[in-house]
Amino acid sequence: METDYLTIKEAGQHELEIKKSRFIADVGRVITEEEAQAFIAGVIAREPKATHHCWAYVLGEHDEIQRESDNGEPSGTAGVPILTVLKRNDLHNAITVVTRYFGGIKLGAGGLIRAYSNATSTGVEATGVVRLVRQRELTLTVSYPLYDRLAHYLTENAISVLDTAYTDAVAVTIAVDLDAVTPTQDAITNLLSNQFTVKEGPVAYHEVPVEIHASNR
């Protein structure tokens, strides 16, 4: 992808009980269809006695790949609600498998839609969401007497420090949003009276935590 996007923080699981049926949401981050199918297969292997394994995933820079399955539930009552929650929360390269153990009470079409939607949204919220931001890595090398001043500036401005190496000087590798590279370098130049060196590194995605109250509406 060439843009920043929201996705699942890490693989996680959350369970709900609705009218004696257990709904277990497994949420994860996937990049390819092969990874998505392997994720689904892993859940099925872990829960072989479940009544249903319903799932959905979205992949690609523009969500070009969207798949869902009701896995035996009435058409449109499981896979589509799961997919809808992922899309309404603007999640990309994300998957959810909701495993159901039938508890003996039928929920009806509307009840199933609400159950699978709620299982997905609470699973996403419990697992967590991050924004993947394209940032430039910069390695700043300063003398020991100036290091504390630099470290304070980075902390005060919430700039992510990826690595710090201590040799005859201190080399600090930071990650900066692409549109902030020049302003950041200018600010540090003024702060340290140009008594440092900078080496530009690659552009890479870095995770920024996001607070989310997942929506299923």
Labelled PLM ranges:
Residues 1-76, 197-209, 213-217:
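C-terminal regulatory domains involved in ligand/effector binding and gene-expression control
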Residues 128-146:
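Short glycine-/aliphatic-rich beta-strand segments at the starts of folded cytosolic domains
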Residues 174-183:
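Terminal, non-globular segments
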Residues 47-50, 157-162, 189-197:
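A common structural junction motif
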Residues 78-127:
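Active-site beta-strand/loop microenvironment that shapes enzyme catalytic pockets
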